[in-house]
Structures are given as C-alpha cells and as structure tokens.
Amino acid sequence: MTMFNKIVKEFQWGQHTVRMETGEIARQASGAVIVDVEDTVVLATVVAAKSPKAGQDFFPLTVDYIEKTYAAGKIPGGFFKREGRPSENETLTSRLIDRPLRPLFPEGFYNDVQVVIHVLSINPEIPADIPALIASSAALAVSGIPFNGPVGAARVGYKDGQYLLNPTRAQIAASDLDLVVAGTERAVLMVESEAHQLSEDVMLGAVVYGHEQMQIAINAIHDLVREGGKPEWDWAPAPKNEALIAKVSEIGLPLLQQAYQLRQKSARSTKLKEIYATVQAQLAEAGVEADKVEVGNVLFDLEAKIVRGQILAGEPRIDGRDTRTVRPIEIRSSVLPRAHGSALFTRGETQALVVATLGTKSDEQIIDALAGEYRDRFMLHYNMPPFATGETGRVGSPKRREIGHGRLAKRALIPVLPKDDEFAYTIRLVSEITESNGSSSMASVCGGCLALMDAGVPVKAHVAGVAMGLILEGNKFAVLTDILGDEDHLGDMDFKVAGTDAGITALQMDIKVQGITKEIMQVALAQAREGRMHILGAMQGAMGHARTELSAHAPRMITMKIHPDKIREVIGKGGSTIQALTKETGTTIDIQEDGTITIASTSTDGMAEAKRRIEGITAEAEVGKIYAGTVLKLLDFGAIVNILPGKDGLLHISEIVNERVKDIKDWLKEGQQVRVKLIQADEKGRLRLSLKAALAEEGGSISPIAQGDAPAAAPAAPASPDQQQ
C-alpha cells in the first residue's frame, strides 16, 4: 500500500523516450508534473489563487523557470554557494513558456496563477526548454484550473533538406535552423527561431512539421489528465453589465472614433486619456455606479472594435497608411565620434541608436551554463528607457522584455557575422531605444547591422527586420506591415521577421487566437518579405558595404602561433613576464591553450614590439647559428652568456680565442656584448658557445681588456635578422 496515487505515462517522441508522471511530488500544488527526457528531468508546478484580487483588471500569470546547479552535479560559485538571480537563459526560457500559455486562459479569469519549473537533472545533449514547456502545460491540464489547453511544443532543426524533431545540442550546432513551435491540437500559438538565411517556404514547413509532431505530446497529456487529473473548477466569467456597456458605448464610441482620426501617437494618446476621464465623469453625473476598471475594459473593447473594423473594411490604419506600407525611414551612421561604430535608425515614431564596440578575446562573455561553460564573442544588449514612450518609470537593470527583445535581435544578426578566424574581435552591440511606437526590436536589428558595418565588421549581408500584425474576424483577415504599438495590442497576431535578401535569419510569432491557418501564415510571410526588401533597400542605399578600415579608436589585432610548451615562458613566474610585456608595450595579450596568441592595441608600434619580444622569448636556439650575446657572469673556467630571452649558454675559456687564456678577466667582463656561435646543445637543453668560432666566421677580432678600452669583438658584417633574435 502506497500513500501516492502516482500516474506515469511513457511515449516515444522522435529519437527520444519521454516519461511523464504526476501524483508523487508536490501534491499540495494545484498541479505538478515531472517530465524526464533521457536524463533531462524537470518538475513543473502550478498554483492558482481561489479568487481574484479586488479591482484586478488583467490576468496575473507568472512563469519562473529555475535551473538548479545540482542538476549538472555542480556546486554554485560565489561566496554564498547558492543559486542567485536568474540567468539570461532562465529569463528567456520563462518567456518562452509564458507566451503560448497566456492566450489560453479564459477571458475574465483574473486569479493569480504561478507556474514554477525546476530543472532537477540535465543531460548536456538534451535542452530543458521543451521538456519544461510540456511539463508546464501538463501541470495546468491536471490542475483543473480554467485553461483551454493542453499545449504541445517541439524543437525543429533543418539539415540537408530534412527536418529534425527535437535535435540534440550537437545536431542543433550543425543545423541550419533552430526553431521552437508551441500550440494546441488545432492551432499554432508561438514560434521562436534562428535560421541561416532560409526561405519562407522552408520556415513555414518547419512550423507545420513541428505542429504535427507535437500532437504526440498533447495526446500523452490527455491520457495523464484522464487518469490523474483533478476536478475542473466550477468557474464562470462574471456576467456582462449590458446596461453599462450600452451607456459607455453611447458616450464613448463617437469620441473614440474622433480620437482614432488623429494620426500622431502622442496627440492620440492624450486624447484617449481625456476621453476615459470624460466618460467616467459623465457616468457619475448620470448617477451610474460603475467600477473604473470595468469602464476601462468596455472602452478598450470599443477601441479594438473601431481599429479592427476600419482595417477590415479597407479603410486607412491608425496613422493613415494602407496595410502594406512601411513607415518613412531615416538612417544616419557614424553618429558618435569616439564609438567604434554607431547608427541612428528611425522608422516613423520608432527610433534606435545602436552602438558597436570591438574588443579582444579577453572581453568575451563567459557563461557558466548547466550544460557546461562556454564563451560568447557576440553580445547584444537592448535598453528601452521610459522616455521612449513619453512616460516616467523605473530605470535600472533590464526587465524580461528587454532581455527577450535583445535576444531576438541577436538571433537575427548571428548568421551574417564573420567567423572567428576571419574576424577575431569580440563584438558588443547596444541598442538604445530613444523612441518607441511598435517594432523596436526590429529597429534594433536594422540599426545593429548598420552599426556593425560602420565599425568595419565584415558582415555577409545586410539584415533588416519588420514587425507584422494580423486581424481576423470570421473568414475575413488583414495582414499589417510594420505595425504600431496600438495595432500590436488590438490585433490577433504579432510576428517579427528578420533576414537578408537571401532568406530569413530570425522569426518570432505570437498568436492570440486559434483560427489562423497555414494559408494565412503563408500570406503573412510573403507580405513580410515584401516589407523586409523595402527596408533592405533603404539600408543598402544608406550604407552599401562595411567600412574597410576600423575606427581610429578601435583596437588593432595581430595573431601569432607558438608551441604550446612555450606558453609558460611567455607568461613567466606568477605572470611576471606577460604583465611586464603588456605594461611596457601598452597592449592586451591573450594566449590560448593551443599556443595562439592575440596581441591587441591602438598602437601599431606597441603591437610590433610585443610580437618581437614574444618571438624572442619563444625562439629556439639553433646549433651553428651566431647570436649577439651578453656576458652575465664570469667563472674560473669560462662565462655565462645570454643569447636569447631565457636562453643562457656556457662560453668555455678555451673557446674565447685561439691562444691560451690564463685569466678570463683579461678578455671579458660582465655586461659585455659579444658575438658567439652555438656549437652544441645537449638533450637537457644545455648550450655550449664559441666566441672564436664566431670571430673566424665573421672575420672579426677581440683584444685583451688590458690593451684597449673597448674589449668587444671588432665590427663585422651585420648578422641576418634571425641571428639578431
């Protein structure tokens, strides 16, 4: 007899075996499901408040995806040895899970819902995001909370003309596509992808393929609910106050229709605030008791009805455009005098100032991920301060939205970046959104590409991005190019497409309704290509190609190779040699384990000097070669002479001159410069030198110290450069 009512479902999903269970762990949560995909194990829990907070006018869903270091057999770093603030990957995965779940909660359901996902075990080859999304959907499904799911999800790769279902990390690295799609049995709700300039048909095919394959997971969730699901909540939306709706419509509809004739955002926003206040005041005068939140919801529905109706009727959009027109574009490059690269990209009332900075390998971001530590040479940071929308607000660390928008823009640009061996710089792009009225992430893509080109980064092609919208009513639909912020809020689909002339590099899609077909998506993608090509034309006209020279303020770099065994000599004891080198030459020096050395500096002379000194430190002494040496120490039987950095040899007393030498001090002194020939090197690295052999070969001479003030070898023909090492 067990105290648990444990339900387990197993199914084969592509190349992976999936195990899904509920009823044993986290039983006090509204719903809890563990999903195990070949040792990647996640626990998703859901808890919902029994009633909404007073005055609540939105659905308060929170999703927290948490990676535990013990999942990979690690102990956290730092002083406290605990997991700290969410990593960028945790934030992005939380958003990935939130986006397909949120539209499926019924309208009017305002109870707090919290979804928490813990990664308990990680197989480095199996990413945890798809298991986490499946587990979250299953936990909601078994909880009985009002939810129009379940949701399925799949990752799709593309290689050699074939789609790959839930590829491993190794397969993703070799794939031309990394696409995540989520949806219900009937409809796609969310797409997130990065691609290597693939066509619209290939991208749409991947979405359809992923939706077909996720049905296996959806069916397994249905089976789990049948055996282990909790009773469904007895919940119904609050009845609509038809009398209030009629009164608010009577007062507000004509005013709102007038407001939406204003084409400028700030004027329209000001007018809308006035209308909301006017409606509240007139209701109070009429003695109508009404909750402010309820009135606001009615007015919002009226706004949506006006905007959607105008567009579906073929009337101009909010700002006067038709459905296909892109807003006016203005581009300016080299905006900031000391930055390595910069561009100001303005499209209508959306504006991004994007700045590129070049650095060395030591500037790479080191990411301590669960699957293993790695380095990232390309960073893109997106910031949108409140003034961009004419508002006041908090300024500080980036919010989830900013991290997500930055990641989307980064995905769009990665496929056109040069490889490390072609352009060894670390690159950081910062997109400062200075104005926003829709599509700021796509403005970051356009401005980011131009800033890279302004910095002299040899990108493979121009990349442009455009945000698209869709309005669907029954069998009628309209696709909108380059949407405004209001069109985003009032529409049924928001999708962003970025790419080059050759194809798509990033696609993000969020769908709020379940009636969007493959044919509608096909029309939308074709119209998005039209908009993208228009923007690419404007960008190519403003900057046809990347600058051939870097900014005067950017570091220059040279690369050299040494034997890995010599690395320790370049670094020196406790780093003394490398520290002295960087300080004295004004350079930054990075040394890789394979012996690759990168020297960076704004000074060409400093780089050349650092390279010369490293070559000297790592040079191998060659038997038969003549070197310019320095006498370091006199011995009874000879002298120690330095011929290369870290390379000392013995000049025996018999190898100074042909005649017999009674006292070495008669011929040499410490600090004296002499030319010596390396005549022997044994297996232990001990070197034997000869001064007389060098004199004979070069035709020089040396005099005893007692007979002259300059006891050095007589001038001879200059040695070749390799002898001067």
Swiss-Prot record:
The keyword RNA-binding applies. One of its GO terms (molecular function) is polyribonucleotide nucleotidyltransferase activity. It catalyses: RNA(n+1) + phosphate = RNA(n) + a ribonucleoside 5'-diphosphate. Residues 706-725 have a biased composition (Low complexity). Keywords: Cytoplasm, Magnesium, Metal-binding, Nucleotidyltransferase, RNA-binding, Transferase. One of its GO terms (cellular component) is cytosol. The keyword RNA-binding applies. Its cofactor is Mg(2+). This is Polyribonucleotide nucleotidyltransferase.
